[in-house]
A protein has these predicted regions:
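N-terminal Rossmann-like NAD(P)+-binding subdomain of aldehyde/semialdehyde dehydrogenases
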Residues: 1-132, 326
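Residues at or immediately preceding the N-termini of alpha-helices
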Residues: 27, 41-44, 63, 264, ...
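Conserved C-terminal structural/oligomerization subdomain of aldehyde/semialdehyde dehydrogenase
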Residues: 27-35, 220, 257, 338, ...
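Residue-level signal for inorganic ion chemistry
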Residues: 30, 66, 88, 111, ...
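Short, well-ordered beta-strand elements within core beta-sheets of diverse protein domains
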Residues: 33-39, 54-60, 107, 146, ...
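Structural signal for hydrophobic packing residues in well-ordered secondary-structure cores
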Residues: 55, 59, 74-81, 85, ...
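Rossmann-like NAD(P) dinucleotide-binding subdomain of oxidoreductase/dehydrogenase enzymes
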Residues: 123-266, 394
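ALDH superfamily catalytic-core signature
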Residues: 222, 230-374, 437
């Protein structure tokens, strides 16, 4: 049993003041493999105090100095990336190859993007070109509370920590208690990078405890949260009494619009695989596939075949399979939503309830495809967070756009078409923060975030840094 009960506060690993033991389970075996502490009020207060005391000095460092610390952190991260990949794979079930390339790789990519953003960031400038004595200045916003999820641990931790460090903020990180071990390892990397004591602090805990204290504490200036929309609403309410800056990256129910002027086999195969990737545990997963009616029957066959050919296996095995869901609670939720799809009359063409054949332990699920879904079905409305694809036809471009936008979410949307003109026209009408056309990837440092109940603010690159900055105007200083 791995023992990681201590918290990282003010540059040291310290024993909990009021922590309670919490077992971390391996989702592939359902067995505990590590123990952490869930911090309490005293632990959280200690971390906030350390960050508050250090802010006055850290916020006065130059961007060049902060860049050197980020470079040192990147070096430590790269040197220990094998450890990180194994840690993520064990705690949340990502297959080891995917954990190395995508999960661990995301953290490295974000650190590099923040370094590029720092090189080009304009920290002060005239309000208008050539206007003397009227200056705009960007300054660190203060002490940041960073609350991260379990599904993409380092993607989210580095998006928040890297941006806050670049901006000159100090911080308290609360990772998900379900998958905390990668964040413990990350804290070790921060220590190796030599950041001043108190700049980065980490306290494990649950949302109701540490999360609520951080969100409502008067010495926290910024809250950056990634998780469910329900939890994001609660955090916003908790932060309101002290009027904090709140950045939220929340749920999604992203549409994938497939027009008949594209390569249907390639587009549907790609879309289904993206839906199933990370066992469907991605907020931007393309879980609603809307297909032009003339191509619908072919698309359903392709999606069903893709699901049936998607292998499910242990996370510690090499290959391009998918692993288990992260927890029993997540498994039960996904099973219930698959059953809801069946009960409400959607046609199941692949997968279904229960574990895959030959697997009787671990929170593994069958890649599942529903055809003939309708807009009001639960599987078309609720974020499932499992490898479950819902498909339905459309007749016109206008109908496709209307169906795509018929959701309280607006994180991402996907377009498959052979026409650039159509792609631009449709993209302009989709109410989502990120649009990807014909499988195009997103450039490193692109802004990540969405419309409506998918959140507030953006992460990544220069936009992520700006979430941790205040803008100050200074009038009346002339000359150098």
């Amino acid at each position: 049993m791995i023992d990681k009960r201590n918290f990282y506060i003010n540059g040291s690993w310290v024993a909990p003041i009021s922590g309670a033991d919490f077992l971390v389970l391996n989702p592939a075996t359902e067995e505990p493999y590590a123990v952490i502490s869930l911090g309490g009020k005293d632990d959280t207060e200690a971390a906030i105090k350390a960050a508050r005391v250090t802010f006055s000095s850290w916020s006065m460092t130059t961007p060049q100095e902060r860049a050197e610390y980020l470079k040192a952190l990147l070096a430590s991260y790269e040197a220990r990336s094998d450890e990180m990949a194994k840690s993520i794979s064990t705690e949340m079930g990502a297959p080891i190859d995917m954990s190395m390339t995508d999960q661990t790789g995301a953290g490295k990519s974000h650190l590099k993007a923040f370094l590029r953003a720092l090189d080009n960031f304009e920290w002060s400038k005239p309000i208008r070109p050539g206007m003397e004595g009227q200056e705009l200045v960007h300054e660190a916003a203060g002490v940041a509370a960073l609350i991260t999820p379990w599904n993409w641990p380092m993607n989210q931790v580095v998006l928040k920590v890297g941006a806050a460090l670049a901006a000159g903020c100090t911080m308290v990180l609360k990772p998900s208690e379900i998958a905390p071990m990668s964040s413990v390892l990350f804290a070790e990397m921060v220590h190796e990078a030599g950041l001043p004591a108190g700049v980065f602090n980490m306290v494990n805990g649950d949302g109701a405890g540490v999360g609520t204290i951080l969100s409502s504490h008067p010495d926290i200036d910024v809250v950056s949260f990634t998780g469910s929309t329900r939890a994001g609403i609660l955090i916003s309410k908790a932060a309101a009494d002290t009027v904090k800056t709140v950045s939220l990256e929340l749920g999604g129910k992203s549409p994938n619009l497939v027009f008949d002027d594209t390569d249907i086999d390639a587009a549907v195969t790609r879309g289904a695989r993206f839906c199933f990737a990370n066992t469907g545990q991605s907020c931007n997963a393309a879980t609603r596939m809307l297909i032009e009616r003339s191509a619908y029957d072919e698309a359903v066959k392709v999606a069903a075949a893709t699901a049936k050919s998607t292998r499910v296996d242990m996370p510690n095995k090499h290959g391009d399979h998918i692993g288990p869901l992260v927890s029993e609670a997540q498994f039960d939720k996904v099973q219930a939503l698959i059953q809801a799809g069946i009960d409400e009359g959607a046609r199941i063409v692949a997968g279904g309830v229960g574990r895959p054949e030959g697997i009787n332990r671990g929170w593994f699920v069958k890649p599942t495809v529903f055809a003939d879904a309708t807009p009001n079905m639960t599987i078309m409305r609720e974020e499932i967070f499992g490898p479950v694809l819902a498909m339905m036809p459309f007749d016109t471009e206008e109908e496709a756009i209307e169906l795509a936008n018929d959701t309280p979410y607006g994180l991402a949307a996907y377009i498959q078409t052979g026409s650039n003109e159509r792609a631009r026209r449709v993209a302009a009408k989709l109410r989502a923060g990120m649009i990807q056309v014909n499988g195009s990837g997103r450039a490193a440092g692109s802004p990540f975030g969405g419309y409506k109940q998918s959140g507030v603010g953006r992460e990544g690159g220069v936009w992520g840094i700006e979430e941790f900055l205040e803008i100050k105007s200074i009038s009346g200083i002339f000359g150098d």
